[in-house]
Amino acid sequence: MTTIDLNCDLGESFGAYKMGNDDEILPFVSSINVACGFHAGDPAVMRQTVEKALQHNVAIGAHPGFPDLIGFGRRNMSVSASEVYDYVLYQIGALDGFVKAAGGKMQHVKPHGALYNMAVTDSEIADAIAKAIYHINPGLLLYGLANSEAFIKATEKYNITLVQEAFADRTYKQDGTLTSRTEENALIKNEDEAIKQVLQMVKEGYVESVNGGKVAVQAQTICLHGDGEKAVQFAEKIYRTFKLNGISICAPNK
């Protein structure tokens, strides 16, 4: 039986501002990426998100981003590898404290937004992320874009495990990278088209690029976005589609 992990970014509320559909999404995913206070989230939200994930037996990962609340961590920043290392180490440590306090164990780290996208092609940034993981806990998995040479080389260097990720509702360029969110065709808004893409990736090992070509993708985890208007409906639809197609949903370390 084919097995795949379904992951989602949660814990993005901040103070009085609520974001996402965390409670409704949790039953349909196997792993979550928790914002650690730099691009979103706050200490109370981090604690609550961890506790809810443990109640649902969902694997927990840190979702470190750039210190950019206003831009939600989606804007590129001119930073050194040393700064990236510090940002990532700090945020992993913060979330790990909440996970341990709740009696759980962190499974993975997935960079957020611009930090993630820059690491896909920038070997120094990918290296800094992997080094931070290695120094705090080399047993943590790193979720990174499938086929990214920067992620592959960094995880091999530090002997940590890369979980290759694909996206349900994002379009791909011919080189295997995601279409920038600044482009109109970056998101797949039709649910049926997104589900067709996911099934192609999971069952057939490829995705169609925006140019019409085929790009090989060996995905081990699929990212769902939990903050859209129909996010819960979409998550449930993918969950049920996988079940109907004999695809088992399970976190990598379960």
Swiss-Prot record:
Catalyzes the cleavage of 5-oxoproline to form L-glutamate coupled to the hydrolysis of ATP to ADP and inorganic phosphate. Forms a complex composed of PxpA, PxpB and PxpC. The keyword Kinase does not apply. GO terms for molecular function: 5-oxoprolinase (ATP-hydrolyzing) activity; ATP binding. Keywords: ATP-binding, Hydrolase, Nucleotide-binding. Belongs to the LamB/PxpA family. This is 5-oxoprolinase subunit A. Its EC number is 3.5.2.9. Pfam families: LamB_YcsF. It catalyses: 5-oxo-L-proline + ATP + 2 H2O = L-glutamate + ADP + phosphate + H(+). It comes from Bacillus mycoides (strain KBAB4). One of its GO terms (biological process) is carbohydrate metabolic process. Signal peptide: none annotated. SUPFAM superfamilies: Glycoside hydrolase/deacetylase (SSF88713). HAMAP family: PxpA.
